[in-house]
């Protein structure tokens, strides 16, 4: 079964409930080839949690240099756009083998990686020919989904003082991005024309 960004609160709640009798969740690993998209989530946990350990690791490095504390008290949140990156598939498989809760962020409905996920979250993506249509829900794109996992994990394990403000801001992000795109469109086109051969 696939999930969307609006399901993340319940996904985290379910994971915490499943893991409570074995000591709960102690750490979360953000893993993938799309590391840039995962950085805000890793940083959020590092800055806002007093009890959770967080790391941000390339898929291949994670497989070949797995952290010692990775196991049944872990969440691994993987980003794999088309679900076919061999190293990320191996990292997801390792998560299953170690008993971690495996969350996969992906765009495609069907792919190789989904068999290794406990929760498959399909994020929004602008699939228009030039990726510039801008008609997606930006609150549901990959970076936001990873951040939602982080925010919900911290909030549900130890509380997060700015939780309501976070969701208020998340509700504004699509309009902010659309307005910004309109505002800079002419300047962006002029810049591209001027520097296209540099």
Language model segments and positions:
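Conserved N-terminal alpha-helical segment that immediately precedes and caps sugar-phosphate-binding
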Residues: 1-198
């Amino acid at each position: 079964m696939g999930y969307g960004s609006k399901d993340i609160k319940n996904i985290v709640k379910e994971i915490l409930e499943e893991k409570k009798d074995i000591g709960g969740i102690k750490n979360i690993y953000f893993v993938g080839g799309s590391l840039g998209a995962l950085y805000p989530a890793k940083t959020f946990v590092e800055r806002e949690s007093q009890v959770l350990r967080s790391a941000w690791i390339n898929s291949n490095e994670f497989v070949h240099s797995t952290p010692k504390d990775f196991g049944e008290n872990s969440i691994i949140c993987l980003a794999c756009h088309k679900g076919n990156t061999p190293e990320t598939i191996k990292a997801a498989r390792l998560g299953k083998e170690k008993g971690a809760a495996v969350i996969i962020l992906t765009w495609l409905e069907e792919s190789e990686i989904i068999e290794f996920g406990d929760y498959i979250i399909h994020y929004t993506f602008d699939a228009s020919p030039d990726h510039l249509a801008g008609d997606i829900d930006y609150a549901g794109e990959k970076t936001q989904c990873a951040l939602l996992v982080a925010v919900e994990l911290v909030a549900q394990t130890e509380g997060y003082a700015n939780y309501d403000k976070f969701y208020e801001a998340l509700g504004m992000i699509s309009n902010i991005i659309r307005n910004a795109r309109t505002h800079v469109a002419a300047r962006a086109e002029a810049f591209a024309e001027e520097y296209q051969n540099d």
